[in-house]
Structures are given as structure tokens and as C-alpha cells.
């Protein structure tokens, strides 16, 4: 009897609903997936609702292999005969079949519609919402204002990865939310990382790490900054790391167009964070919008400064001119101003990087997945 009571009270079935629709997997999915796996290891059940893709992400397969129930929504329609005679479980409501005790809804971008929130509320299932990124580039239409407000107001918790993102969402729906919490995303480097400092006798090299996507990451801005005569004369090289997400061709052509092959170099994706920082003196990130960019957190953990825009969580993590450099906007002029300030202090970058490492360890969780798992348990008990 005591065992049965323990199971009923402490072992919970968590539902994870991802709004990811533009690609089979992305950085916005890492926190909920790792949290789901940790909850599995603690004996909890996990049910996942994810968009169907021809290719199943290995991380999803890993959860399923360890007992998670995986619903792949919106699959291609079956042949006519199968549609007539099959009892497709997709026609049934995921919530009614799985009966989760609590649900986490994850949005990669703030405009994502989440009618699943209404379905949770109607069934009395407590739910939380995690927004991984918000921007001023897209505003929710006024005709849908009350719908969005309802989704967020009825949530037990709304989790943001930065205060800046929370403000952007609240401005979008013209509502001050009282049920919010700032959380951290997991990083992909040791918390005690300390890669060796690269030599600088022949000049300085900085890394621009992020998918090659001008709209979000702003690589095009750096091309315009570096084409100025003063930067052409300086011993500074920018190396681009990241997968192509639509703008690699333009990036390479812009570099060629302006004759910047010596100053701007495309490296491609690297899965070794410490290796990047063994070869680079600083991070450059001219993002137009972000949530809480992991590359900033990982660079600081590796004792490197970041030169970045005042977007997402960046200003919360570093002190401008002391443990990093923050551009007040995303224009060429403002990025140039921040990079110029950094360049004038280039011989202090190593010392400033050590301070950056100290600041990030003081201001950011050393185990975001553990912390988030505990936060989700409170949704069920609240």
C-alpha cells in the first residue's frame, strides 16, 4: 500500500509538446529533451508530441528507446484505403490517450501558436510554457491578442531564458505576466573548461559561432564592418563556425565581392567547443535576436570574452568593457563601435577572459537540466 501511494504521489507522467516545425531538430529542443531523459532516469514516465519528419532526430529516438511514448503529429496522409479502414491514433487527442499529469510546451520562437494549451486547460492538466527566443521582428496580430493572452495567463509557469525575452513577449501581448521564471539552457562544455590561450604574435583571431543565417545571427553586418579601410589594415581575422541555414552562399560571395578573403574565413561546423577556443581569442556575435545564446555562455566558460549585441541574456551575463563588449544595437555603426573598443583593449583580452569565466560561473547555473527538472515537478504539485 505504501509503495502504491509513493508511485501515485511521486512518480509523474510528464508530457512534452514541441512547437518545432521548421527543421527536424534545433537548439531550442535541447533543454526539454535532456530534462525528459533525466526525469526518465528518476522513474517518471515521459510522453512526447513532436512534428513528423522523414528523418527522426537521434535525440528523440534515444528517449523512445528508453520508454518514452512518442507521437509524431501531422504525418503525410496514408493511401485512400488505409484512411478508410485504419484507426489512426493521430485522430485521437494525444492528451486523452497519454493522460499526462503535467505538460511542458516549448516554443522555439514567440509567435508560435499553442492551441494545445487550451486542450490542457479544458482537461485540468497543469502546463508550463518555455519560450526559447523572442524578438521585435514579428508582432502578434491584434485579432489574436486575446487567444495568446489566454494561453499564457492560464499556464502554471511561463519560462524564459532571459529577462529581455520576457519583456518582448509581454510587449507583444500587452500583458504583464505574474507567473514567470527565468531559466538556463544546458551548455556543451565542461563547467571547469580552461583551454590554452592561443599565441597572438602574428595577430588576433576571433570566432563568430552560429548557424549561417543572416536574419538571426547577423554575419552580413560583420562583412560591412570589416570592409572598412581601418579593419583591412589591422591584424585581425574573423573565422565563421556553423552549419549553413540558408546564407552560406551569400556570405562567401560577399567575402569575395569585397576582397576580404584574408580577414574573413569560413570554417564550417565544429562540435568541439574547447578546440574552437584553443584557436581563437574572443567571440564575436552580432545577433539581431537571441534567447540566451549558448555560444556566449560556452565562450565565457572557456575564459574568452564576447563582443556581442545587447540581445537576449548577453548584458545579464557580462559587464561591458570589463568581461566583454556590448554593442547597443545591430547597426554597422554600433557593432563597429563595440569592436573598436575591444580592439583598443586587445592586449587585455586574456585577463578580461578570466574575469568573464568568473562572472559566468557566478551568474549562470552549473546544472540547468537538474534545475529545470525540479521546476517542472512544481507544476504538478502547484
Q: What is the predicted role of each segment?
A:
Residues 251-268:
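Nucleotide-activated donor-binding/catalytic signature segment of Leloir-type glycosyltransferases, i.e.
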Residues 341, 348-362, 374:
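A short, well-ordered alpha-helix in the C-terminal region of glycosyltransferases
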Residues 154-179, 187-189:
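A short, active-site helix/loop in glycosyltransferases that binds the activated sugar's phosphate group
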Residues 76-79, 111, 125-142, 157:
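A short, histidine- and acid-enriched strand-loop-helix "catalytic/donor-clamping" loop
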Residues 305-308, 318:
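Short hydrophobic beta-strand element within catalytic cores of glycosyltransferases
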Residues 26-37, 204, 213-228, 333:
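A conserved mid-protein helix/loop that constitutes part of the nucleotide-sugar donor-binding site
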Residues 320-321, 325-332, 341-346:
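Conserved acidic donor-binding segment of nucleotide-sugar-dependent glycosyltransferases
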Residues 269, 288:
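Aromatic "clamp/platform" in nucleotide-sugar-dependent glycosyltransferases that forms part
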